Design a protein with these regions (language model features):
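Acidic (Asp/Glu)-rich catalytic clusters
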Residues: 7-19, 39-52, 89-93, 126-135, ...
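Active-site beta-loop-alpha junctions enriched in small/polar residues
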Residues: 26-32, 56-58, 102-106, 141-145, ...
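Charged catalytic cores and adjacent phosphate/nucleic-acid-binding surfaces used
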Residues: 59, 111-192
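Short, flexible active-site loops
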Residues: 65-70, 102-115, 141
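Hydrophobic faces of well-ordered beta-strands that scaffold small-molecule active sites
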Residues: 23-27, 51-53, 97-99, 138-140, ...
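Hydrophobic, aromatic-enriched interface-forming segments
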Residues: 74-112
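A metal-dependent hydrolase metal-coordination microenvironment
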Residues: 1-62, 66-79, 83, 181
């Protein structure tokens, strides 16, 4: 990523639209264990308003790619994702909120058909407790609706469990990588 070019574009847009919308400067950090030194330096390299930490790459594969699920069951694939996410959360503290903690479910062979909080309760509770202990928020990402899951990432059950465990920082995101997906189905999240 060309951070200086990104910042220049951001500042130009912030000035251009200052009377129409309030813009904040931030990044989504792709959490990976081998970046334990680099990501905190990147996070501290500029005056970001907000940073999201997310797991996308697990054992050198993105669950977006069907290859991630080859050679193991869907349950094993989901569990491995959560194990690596937990490892990342124990390693990193340089971000404000954790993005789409069950991202893997979007791309599973059966998506969320065989997925539930109860099936992964132990590790999901560990993940939520680490977030709470570190004062890191949990993102409610509405892209799950876009991908046909019928719920955000994470599910309402996980959002409620986060609150039960003492979690207080909840952020709202949509994986708006295209203008038409900005604030996608936010009205559904308001009902949670």
């Amino acid at each position: 990523m060309d951070l200086p070019a990104y910042k220049k574009t951001f500042l130009n847009l912030k000035e251009k639209y200052q009377h129409q919308i309030q813009l904040f400067y931030g990044l989504e950090l792709g959490l990976q264990p081998h970046l334990a030194k680099e990501l905190p330096l990147l996070a501290a390299s500029d005056s970001f308003d907000f940073l999201i930490g997310s797991a996308h790459i697990i054992d050198r594969l993105d669950p977006y790619c069907p290859e991630y699920f080859q050679g193991r069951s869907e349950q094993e694939s989901y569990l491995r994702y959560f194990q690596v996410l937990l490892e990342n959360l124990k390693t990193f503290s340089c971000f404000d909120t954790c993005g789409h903690i069950d991202y893997v479910v979007r791309y599973g062979p059966a998506k969320n058909k065989n997925y539930s909080y109860q099936a992964y309760r132990e590790i999901l509770d560990e993940i939520l407790k680490v977030l709470i202990e570190k004062g890191i928020g949990l993102e409610c990402n509405t892209a799950g609706f876009k991908y046909g899951l019928g719920h955000p990432n994470p599910t309402e059950e996980i959002l409620l469990r986060y609150h039960e465990l003492g979690g207080e920082i909840l952020t709202l995101g949509s994986d708006g990588h295209a203008p038409k997906h900005l604030a996608y189905d936010f009205e559904k999240a308001g009902n949670l």
